[in-house]
Design a protein with these regions (language model features):
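Beta-strand-rich, repetitive solenoid scaffolds
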Residues: 4-13, 18-23, 28-35, 58-61, ...
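Domain-scale recognition of soluble eukaryotic interaction modules
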Residues: 120, 126-165
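Terminal beta-strand-rich extracellular "head" domains
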Residues: 73-129, 133
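A short, structural micro-pattern
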Residues: 3, 21, 83, 126, ...
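Surface-exposed ligand/attachment interfaces on beta-rich extracellular proteins
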Residues: 11-17, 39-63, 72-97, 141-151
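Substrate-binding and catalytic surfaces of secreted/luminal carbohydrate-active proteins
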Residues: 67
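Glycine-rich, low-complexity segments
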Residues: 3-52, 94-99, 105-107, 156-165
Length: 165
């Protein structure tokens, strides 16, 4: 467990715009500034499904460039075809780092879902937004399409990703 050292507190300054940490007593630099903190709600725009109106309000917290989002997807309708299930994000994601994916950490808990997949996980893709990746034993990876989710399936989703700014 790390602790905040007292010398770090002495070298911390606050202004109307930022909280700055100076670890060596020298001039403060932008890399050590926490100038952006925000929390709120937003309504994701979904493709491939229509979310139950009671679950349209998702939450987010943004600290610096890290954004954590969470909410519930319970489709009230699907296009029941090969349309990818995806949504926009409250903040533009950073450029892709590897394999076309942005830095993402997330999880999905499900209820009332009848899938033959080994698992699902949310991913963030620059220029696309949030997609749900399906994991199939010995068959690779794919993206969830509207025909693989049914009305009233419940997906509780949490994702942390890097924003562009």
């Amino acid at each position: 467990m790390s602790r905040l050292k007292t010398d770090a507190i002495r070298n911390t300054s606050a202004s109307a715009d930022a909280l700055t940490f100076d670890t060596n007593g020298n001039t403060k630099i932008a890399d050590n500034e926490l100038a952006d903190y925000e929390e709120g709600t937003w309504t994701p725009t979904w493709t491939g499904v229509t979310n139950n109106a009671s679950y349209n309000s998702w939450k987010y917290i943004k600290i610096g460039k890290m954004v954590m989002i969470w909410g519930t997807l319970i489709p009230s309708a699907t296009t029941n075809d090969s349309t990818d299930v995806k949504s926009d994000l409250p903040f533009t994601q950073a450029a892709n780092h590897t394999n076309g994916l942005a830095q993402t950490v997330g999880s999905i808990s499900t209820h009332h879902v009848n899938w033959t997949k080994e698992g699902v996980t949310p991913i963030i893709q620059a220029g696309v937004g949030m997609r749900i990746q399906e994991i199939q034993d010995d068959a690779g990876l794919g993206y969830m399409v509207s025909s693989s989710v049914a009305v009233n399936d419940q997906l509780m989703i949490t994702v942390t990703y890097e924003a562009a700014t």
